[in-house]
């Protein structure tokens, strides 16, 4: 029968009372909880604030030195918990205790180095824990102790400490990133899950300052793509807003040619991604920095203006037509011979706002079925449905999102939209093409 830590002793461990353990007859490393936490794990996990004194930790390790390296069921040693909860003074004590031990004669690695690199069941080191929880003081201690050899290896999820820090928000985050960048003398690992890098992460959260710091260290990160072929610029284009395109600007400042990078499957560039998201300011910045990228089309022959139509946002489409480089795309045909206005003709059947765009555009041309824009508008349901289905097939976003474009689907938004269309149609006359 398994015997677990006595509840009274557990409480003393939580509170950091050494006296009950001072003359305890059983070895302290045999006092375990069901998760195999030792009294040090219990103590460190219970401290919501950094302990003012390291007395309890010092005295326990004096009495039972093996506890320094003893792991719980998750493979966590006391250093993992001290790093997670930001107990920098305890981290120093643990490292000093490890330094006092003799170096392994075979490997030549000191016990302190060995402890710093120990991983839990998810392959997280103490540095991973400190970075994830934004413990800048702990990160400073850990990175300085293990340089210049520190490898910054990835955990089972492919996350390096730098990637974890770049992915998060909150206080101390910038200091964590600065400490890692400053104290890494050897090769720095920027990697993250699914081929992403810390620059992808910074782009996703809209952090232009971190993006600039990373590029100052490693400029080629602008061309590093994830497993789907998305560059950091793809992420910045996707996550930018009408008001904030700061990361897009930084990435293009360092490497405007990143706008030429097309993803693996659908061959969409960052301009396509900005278009489907309706991020017109990001589109303006991309075409101003790399004008020729407008010529790139996806695997269906769609240019950026086709994607703006797929975004279903008339105001964005009108704004794009005011940009000369994008306005020229309105007559360009895809692999089926459809211009962006052929797509609009299908939408105009069910949406008065698109009907207004259609009749103001005055674009002509036949697709490969010999159908003009007027033919599609006046066509049968099958022709219209085929185009509407193509507008739905715009691919996936990052992190496995099923759709890129976010549409108004709930009943409340639908009613508001119908009311707006009705109001605008009453206030602004719209010409109608006579159906044949």
Which residues does each predicted region cover?
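Regulatory and partner-binding modules of innate immune sensors/adaptors
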Residues: 1-436
């Amino acid at each position: 029968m398994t015997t677990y830590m006595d509840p009274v002793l557990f409480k003393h461990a939580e509170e950091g009372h050494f006296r009950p353990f001072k003359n305890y007859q059983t070895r302290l490393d045999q006092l375990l909880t069901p998760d195999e936490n030792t009294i040090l794990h219990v103590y460190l996990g219970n401290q919501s604030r950094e302990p003012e004194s390291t007395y309890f930790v010092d005295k326990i390790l004096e009495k039972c030195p093996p506890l320094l390296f003893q792991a719980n069921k998750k493979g966590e040693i006391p250093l993992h918990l001290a790093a997670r909860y930001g107990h920098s003074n305890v981290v120093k004590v643990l490292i000093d205790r490890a330094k006092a031990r003799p170096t392994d004669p075979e490997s030549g690695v000191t016990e302190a180095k060995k402890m710093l690199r120990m991983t839990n069941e998810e392959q997280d080191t103490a540095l991973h824990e400190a970075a994830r929880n934004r413990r800048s003081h702990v990160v400073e201690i850990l990175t300085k102790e293990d340089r210049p050899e520190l490898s910054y290896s990835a955990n089972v999820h492919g996350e390096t400490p730098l990637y974890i820090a770049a992915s998060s928000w909150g206080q101390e985050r910038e200091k964590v990133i600065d400490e890692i960048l400053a104290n890494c003398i050897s090769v720095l690992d920027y990697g993250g899950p699914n081929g992403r890098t810390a620059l992808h992460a910074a782009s996703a959260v809209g952090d232009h300052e971190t993006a600039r710091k990373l590029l100052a260290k490693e400029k080629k990160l602008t061309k590093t793509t994830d497993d789907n072929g998305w560059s950091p610029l793809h992420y910045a284009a996707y996550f930018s807003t009408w008001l904030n395109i700061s990361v897009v600007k930084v990435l293009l400042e360092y490497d405007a040619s990143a706008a030429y990078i097309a993803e693996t499957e659908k061959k969409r560039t960052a301009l396509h991604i900005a278009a489907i998201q309706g991020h017109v300011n990001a589109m303006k910045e991309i075409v101003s920095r790399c004008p020729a990228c407008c010529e790139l089309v996806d695997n269906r022959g769609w240019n950026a203006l086709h994607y703006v139509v797929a975004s279903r946002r008339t105001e964005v489409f009108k704004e794009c037509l005011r940009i000369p480089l994008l306005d020229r795309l309105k007559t360009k045909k895809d692999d089926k011979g459809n211009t962006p206005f052929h797509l609009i003709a299908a939408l105009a059947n069910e949406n008065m706002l698109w009907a207004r765009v259609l009749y103001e555009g005055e674009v002509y041309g036949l697709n490969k079925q010999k159908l003009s824009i007027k033919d599609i508008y006046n066509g049968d349901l099958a022709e219209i449905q085929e185009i509407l289905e193509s507008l739905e097939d715009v691919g996936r976003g990052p992190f496995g999102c099923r759709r890129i474009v976010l549409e108004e689907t709930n009943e409340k938004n639908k009613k508001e939209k119908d009311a707006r269309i009705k109001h605008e149609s009453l206030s602004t006359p719209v010409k109608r093409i006579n159906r044949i």
